[in-house]
C-alpha cells in the first residue's frame, strides 16, 4: 500500500498567521498585506512548479489576481482572531509524470472544490529531495473560508437559526436577547465533507494507478480502520516544517522520522 497524505487546517489570525503570507509562501511570490502592512517575499523559494487561481464561474475576474484576492480576504475579516482560509496539502505520486500530477490536482480541485463554490489558490510543489533523498511532489490549495454570493459579492460565513417555542415564537434568554445557533453557510468545515474529499482523492489517484497498470494503491482510512499495526505521525505545524526545510532538526521532526522508519520496518515484517 502506497503512502497517503491529505491534510487540511485553518489559517487563523489568533495563531499569528495571515492569508497573504500563506499565499505568498505557497506561490513563491512577493505579496504585500494591506491589513498589517507586512510584505512577504518568497521569490527565492524553490520547488514551485505551478501556481494559479481557480474560480467559480460567477466570481469577478479581479479575483484571478493573487494580491487582490487575498487582500480582499484580509480586509473583509475585521476580527483580530478571524479565521481566514482553509489550507489543504495533498501528496502527489512519484509514479506519475509531472504533467500527470498537475492534471490530477487540477481535476480534483475543479470537481470537488470549485464546482462547490470555493475560490481556490492552487500551487504544485516538487522540491528537489526531502526525507532522506525521496522526491516529495505535492500540492497546496488555499481557500477563503468566507464564500462568494451568486452575484460575486462576499457572503456570510454563518447565519442565525433562532430557538423557537412550541408555537413557533422566538425564545429570549435571561439577558433579553434572542437565543440562536450560529450555523455555517457552507458544509466545507464539516467532518463528513472532509471524509468525502479524502475518499474522493484516494479513488481518483487509484483510478489513475490502475489505468497505468500499476499495482500500488493508496487508502484514505486510518491505520486502525485498515487493520494495520502502524504508528500515525504527529502534526508538525507550519513553524516546525519551516525549520525542518531550513535544515534545523526539531523534536517533532525527529519523532516523525523515527515513526516512519519504524513503520517501514513493520511493513517489511508483515510483507
Language model features with spans:
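N-terminal nicking endonuclease/strand-transfer module with a His-rich metal-binding environment
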Residues: 1-271
